[in-house]
Each structure stands twice: as structure tokens, then as C-alpha cells.
Amino acid sequence: MSESLGIACLRGLARRASRVVLVDAGMGGRKIKAGVLLGAGLALAGRLRREVSERRVGIVLPPGAGGAIANLACVLAGKTPVNLNFTSGRAASESAIRQAGIRTVISAKAMEEKVGEHFPQTERKLDLGVLLKEEKRKAIVWSVLALILPAKVLAWAANVSTAGGDDEAGLLFTSGSTGEPKGVVLTHRNILANLRQIDGVLGDLELKSLLGCLPLFHSFGFTVTLWWPLTGGPQVVTYPSPLDPQALGEVIGKYTVDLLVTTPTFLRMLMKRAGREKLGGLKMVVTGAEKLPAALREEFAQKIGITVHEGYGMTEGSPVIAVNRAGAERAGTVGKLVEGLEVRTVEEETGKELNRGEAGILEFRGPNIFPGYLGRPDLTEKVLQDGWYHSADFGRLDEDGFLTIEGRRARFSKIGGEMVPHGVIEEHLNEWLDRAGRVRGGGYEVMVTAVEDERKGEMLVVLHSCPMDGIEAERELRERGVPNLWIPKKFVRVGSVPILASGKLDLAAGRKLAGG
């Protein structure tokens, strides 16, 4: 796969030039045809080639027509789009800008005003609205040419970058949930391989549209809801935020969205606010980023009438690793690996390979596995050996090829020599609170974290934003058969459980709250 992502997008858009490929629900349902999107991307790409000398370009835009055009223009021009996390705070964005050597950022005036003081600061800011007005005539010409010229001729005429293969195509910074963000380099080969793997899982379902509300700085938002539609996947219906379940329910119902990719946290909020009337038309729902609680899966099937398919991915995997297929799912697992990917489990301490069915640290090898962290050969060497990526997750592969994730290493505490999983305790507490009617908004309101303990090494701490009596919670956990060593002894009431824009729990912020 030596092809470039830019050429793949050009071909995918030119082939459907007269069809609507993006509906921007955040802009009143504006419908963007593939040819128009391609024309704007080609015009802006020419501008970037002329005026931006550096390789990487920062982008601060939400999901929508603007975000799609800015990212498309970068890959057409041979630039690396770096979608900056504008929700992570000044320190994290400054770190990303410094590591990537970003001098220019593409955004919009409204976006800068919304982000305010946390807006990433660079030498130069390009307003997308102004750029598109200035390049309007060229964009129209290119959109017309997209209707009449063969893709190869169009690419040659527009001087579209053909660099591909193992060259850098995207740069995503980890959420920083466990520390300073790391730059994950994704090559053209990585992204295109994962797109083909996604097609292999979902291509036969005849999906006409998917919801694109995950941030573009999130790996699923970047690959699944940005590049998949542009390279030939289903139409994407965009909304600028995943945090508004009421609006998202309206969007899903109004535009008859077929595919929803989200996190369990956001799905629970959506189920509570939208209901069957708006969500019942979905053909498939896939969750990732955190374990899907069995109670949520059952409740969604009962109330909405749709089976939730749990999947699994990571930024270093471009990101899709495994997913439960429609009609061939196994509850409690994340499904089978995507095509071309290998997995093995190893002992954490020795690195010894374990037998199939035995739980251990998961390692993956395949065309969608990243080549390394930006400017950090030390970190890269720790996690990549002979093409095998040493993940931070515990799991096991059964005899039928279904993968089960036991939890992230960062979500375990070593207490009295035993590894205690935070996620299992959270699942018990969330299920209990939900059935007791104490959960207010639909999102998870409990987080288990840990602080240092001189006697046992670590002490579990429960952060909760809803009413909870510690003694009552301890009794409930014991009645559910939770081992005594796993039962937390400290409970801290907080205003809200810290959650990242990606829908994951903010582990670093949680530890700070617990230690405070």
C-alpha cells in the first residue's frame, strides 16, 4: 500500500462528485456534494503549498464541513494535518505544538472565540472562512473539473501529492489521561489499511450514513468519521460535539443516520435523552474507548430495540483493532480482529508468550500498527519490537477468535500483591446506582482511582458525583461477590467525574481529585 491518502480521497470524491457526501447538522443541515468538497480542498491545498513551508499544519476545528476541508487540503498538499485538542488545556496544547513544530494553525474566528484563553497559540493563524472566500473561484473551477476529468488527470492538474506508503500522513496526540501527550505518527499505509479493514467489517451492511460527532483529534473521529467517508465510505452527518445528547438524538432521527460509533458514557446519555423514537432507525451501534457494561447493553436492547456491538481500538492502531460483527457477536468480548492483524498475549514481567486463552498483556502486529512516537525513540523502543506493539491492555483471545479486554494497565491497582481492576468495581457501582435511580443525567457518575498507601502500596478511592453512602456501597459490593481486597474504603463526593472530550475518564485529573 504505497498509495497516498490524498490520492485515495481525490479518487473517492471524484467518483461521487455529484452525490452528497457530508451533511453539516451543526450548520443547519448544509449538504455538501463530493465535488464541491474536493474543489474546496484542492483550492486550499494550492494556497497551503504556496504559503506554508513547514510540514505539519495545526487544525482547531470541530467535526463539520470546515474540519473536513482543512484536513483534506493538508493531505492533498502533502502536509500532515495535526488536529489539536482544544479541550485539554494550555499546557497540553503547547506541548503538542512544540513537539510537532507547528507554526501555522487553521481555524475559524467563531472557534477561537469559543475556546477562549485555551486556544492554541502559534506564530500564524489562518481563518478558514477568509481563505475559502479568497479561493472561491478556484474552488468552483476545481469542482467543475472534478465532474468531467478522470481522477488521474485531475490529480496531475492539481499537483496533488503522491507521497504515500510509510510517509507520515497524520499526527494524533494521546489524550494525556495518564500524563503528557505523546505524538502518535500514522502513515499513509496505516490509515489506508485501517480503512480497508473497516470496510471488511462494515462494507456488507449497506450503510448509507454515519454520525460524525467525535472530535477530529480523537483517533476514531479522525479515521472512521473523517477519512472513511472521504475515501468512499458512507455519507457522514456531522455535529460539532458529542456532549449534547438531546441535539444528537434529533440529528440521528432527522437525517436517518444508520451507524453510530460512540462510547458507553455517551451512549447512556443518548439513550436517556433521545429514546426509541429517534434512535430506533439506527442499523448498527458500536461502542469503544471503554468497556461496555452488560447492564447498558441489555437496557439499550430493551428500550431501543438494537444490539450494541462492542469494539476495541487504540490510537496506535489507526485505530480499529477488533469489533463484534452483526449477526456474529459475542457479548462481553470486543469481537474478532480486523483482517491482517495478529495478536498474542505475554506475561507482564517476563514478556514470555502465553498460550491461547490465557490472559496477559496484549501485543499486536499488522499494517495498521503505527511506526512510533514523534521524537521519542526511547518510548518507541519500549512498545515496538519486531513489529509487535506492546499495548497497555490486559486481555485474552479465545479458541473461536473473540478478544476479551480485561482492562488497561493504568486502570489496575496492585494491592497486597494482587492486581485489582478499577473498571469491574465501577461497573458494579454504576449498575447499582442506576437501578436505584440515583444517576441524574445518564452519564457515568462514578470513577475508581487510587492513591499511594504505605501499608498496601495503593488504596482505592471512589469519586462520585451522585449521592452515595460509603458503608452502603461497601455492603452492596460484598453482596455482589466482590472480593474484600477489591472493596474501596474511601469515597469522595465531587461536582462531576472528570471526563475527556473523547468520552474517556480523565485518569490524571481523577488521581489529583483523589489525592486532594
Regions found by a protein language model. Name each.
Residues V21-A68, L72, G89-E94, L147-I148, ...:
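Conserved AMP-binding/adenylate-forming core of the ANL superfamily
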Residues K336-G340, K352-K382, E418-V420, V424:
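Conserved ATP/PPi-binding loop(s) of AMP-dependent carboxylate-activating enzymes
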Residues V105, L260, G366, P371-G372, ...:
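AMP-binding/adenylate-forming catalytic core of the ANL superfamily
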Residues A17-V20, V130-F173, G179-E180, G200-S209:
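Conserved pre-ATP/AMP-binding loop-to-beta segment of ANL
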Residues L192-S209, F217-D258, R273:
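Conserved AMP-binding/adenylation subdomain of ANL enzymes
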Residues L37-A43, L149-V153, V184-L205, L267-M271, ...:
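Conserved structural elements of the adenylate-forming
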Residues S143-L147, V257-V261, M271-R330, E342:
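Gly/Ser/Thr-rich phosphate-binding loop
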Residues Y312, R344-E363, L397-D400, G470, ...:
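Conserved beta-loop-beta connector loops within the AMP-binding
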